[in-house]
C-alpha cells in the first residue's frame, strides 16, 4: 500500500510523539495503514513513556484522534484517555464530519470530564436546549456556541447560562436568536470576555460596505445589545461585536459601563463613526482596537 493511503490522524499522532523524543534518534516513515502498526515499527516503545509525558502529547490531539485512534492503542493509553484531566477543555469543531449521533458523542465527552469541564466550544447545528442544559451542569469558565443553532431558544440559553455564574468567557457566533444579554450579564457577574458575532450570517464576506445588503436586514441601527452590555457587564476586559448594528451612542454607553475594557473589536459595525471625541476616547481607554473597516481575514468563521 502506498504512503498516500496512510490515515491522516495516525500520522498526526505519530508526529507528536516524535517531537517529544529527547534522544534525537533518526526516525523512518512507514506506509502502514493503522496507528498500532505505525507505533510498533518505530524503534522506541512509545507505550513506555512516562504517563505525564503521554498525557501532554495526547492533549494536543483532536477529539477525532482521541476517540477513533489513541484510546484504542493499548490499555495504558485507554486509561489516560479516560482520565477526567483529559477533558477539562473540549472543542467539538473537528467532529463536524462525524457520521454518527453528535448529541450522544457530545454527552459522552462531557461525561468523561466527571464534572471537571471548564471550557467547551460547540460548533454544531444539532445543539438544542436540552443538550445545552446538560453541558452547563458543570462549573464552566468558558462557553463557545458557534454556527447557527435553530433548536436553541432564547429562554434555553438564559436558563443554561444561569447555571454557570462563574463563567468568564462567552462566545456566540451566527446565532439565529436574539440573546437576552442583560439577563446573561446579571447571571454571570464574573464575565470578562464577550464575543457576539453575526459575521457570515448577516453581512457579506468581503470587507466592503454594501448598503443594498444592509438595508434588507431590518433596523439599520440598534443599540439594544450595547446598552444591555453597558448595564450588566461592568467587568468586561475583552469585547468583540462583529457585524453589530450599534451606533456611537451604544459604543459610548459601553465605554461608560465597562471601565476595565482593554480589547475592543467592532469590525463590520458600520453604524459606528470612529472620529472626533469618540475616537479619542477609544484610543485613550482601549489597548487593542479593531475598527469597523479592518480586515476579517483572521476570523475563524470567515466564509462559513
From Swiss-Prot:
Family annotation (Pfam families): F-box-like
Gene3D superfamilies: 1.20.1280.50, Ribonuclease Inhibitor
MF GO annotations: SCF ubiquitin ligase complex binding
LRR repeat windows: 132-159, 173-198, 218-241, 243-268
Keyword Repeat annotated: yes
F-box domain boundaries: 43-90
Keywords on record: Leucine-rich repeat, Repeat
Residues that span the membrane, as ranges: none
UniProt name for this protein: Putative F-box/LRR-repeat protein 21
Gene encoding the protein: FBL21
